[in-house]
Amino acid sequence: MTESDERSLRDLLLESADDLENVLKMIIDTLINREKSVMLKSGESVTNIVRLFDAKQESVRKLLQKVPEFQERESLIRTLKAHVEKRDEVIQQVENNLKACEVALTRSCFHANQKVKKMNEAALRPVNSETLIKLSHQISKHNSVSAPLTWQIGDPSRPFPQEHEFRTGQLLNPKIQSSGPQILLGKSSAQKPIIASPSASSSNGGTAPTRTVGTPLVNSATNGDYSPRTGYGAEETSPIQEQVLLGVTPNEKQWQNPPMPGAATSSQSPLSGAPQSPSSPSVKLKISGIPNRPGDIDQVQEVRDVEQMSSDSSNSSDSSDDEGSSKKTRGRNK
């Protein structure tokens, strides 16, 4: 029984079927060949062979009764195998996730250690922000590809802002609306008389009439520190800045704005739309791209003073030439 229990039900059924077949062959052989039958000669009777056949049939019936139990057991085994496979998949997925987490944690620990080392080195050797700005300025000065329209050679404010510009910028003061440098014609609050060109003087050697011009082209009203991005904190934006913000390049007339000789006194500037007094035909002030910074107004005023002195000297030389020619004509008449 123990040996039969160790074997599978299929093997037991096959073995019982083979035994029944052999016993059945022996019975048929004995009945057909009684004289030549080996079983009869050895003392075995047909009755014993039939009993053996009945015993084999009984064993087969017992095995067949065990079939439903074995079927239930097999179905349970298959169900358990399916559940085991599913659990294996879940375990494999969790294992993969754990390995990925381990790799990510190892990387983050490595990078965190590097960052901590860099932070410790930076704490041991602090660097001023002004030094970084200077170095970045040197790098951008030699490797940059674009610049603002108002930038000139030697302008230290490009392209990175200074610390005071950070403090007065829109990030710290979001309510203050500031604009870039304004190149506007100021109102004629302080007018200066200048002498016109010799061509405008009278033909009889008389003195030329005096004319007045407005304030310098650069707006002298400064409000706070200058920044190439925020300006002096002006609230209004010039037409040129509006064109630059829209992506339109101003033409040469808008930058130079040369006064035409003999123009009316109520002419308006194309930049600000404010009335502007006509200047002398010989004095043409050409200022292009000067940013609104402290110190530029004095330079413009110095240029105007030099031009005024040159015009005065030319007028005096022309008047002396006219006096000399008049004296010569009088001597000839005498």
From Swiss-Prot:
Q: Which UniProt keywords apply?
A: Activator, Coiled coil, Nucleus, Transcription, Transcription regulation
Positions of the UniProt region annotated as Disordered:
188-234, 252-334
Q: Which residues cross the membrane?
A: none
A Pfam family of the record is Med4
Stretches of Low complexity bias are at 188-203
Its BP terms in the Gene Ontology are: regulation of transcription by RNA polymerase II
Coiled-coil annotation: which residues? 76-100
- Compositionally biased region (Polar residues): 204-225, 264-282
Instruction: Give me the Gene Ontology terms describing cellular component.
Output: core mediator complex; mediator complex
Q: Where can this protein be found? A: Nucleus
According to the UniProt entry, its GO molecular function terms are: transcription coregulator activity
- InterPro entries (alphabetical): Mediator_Med4
> What's its job?
Component of the Mediator complex, a coactivator involved in the regulated transcription of nearly all RNA polymerase II-dependent genes. Mediator functions as a bridge to convey information from gene-specific regulatory proteins to the basal RNA polymerase II transcription machinery. Mediator is recruited to promoters by direct interactions with regulatory proteins and serves as a scaffold for the assembly of a functional preinitiation complex with RNA polymerase II and the general transcription factors.
Assembly, in brief, is: Component of the Mediator complex.
| Family (UniProt) | Belongs to the Mediator complex subunit 4 family.
Task: Tell me what this protein is called.
Answer: Mediator of RNA polymerase II transcription subunit 4
**Encoding gene (name):** mdt-4
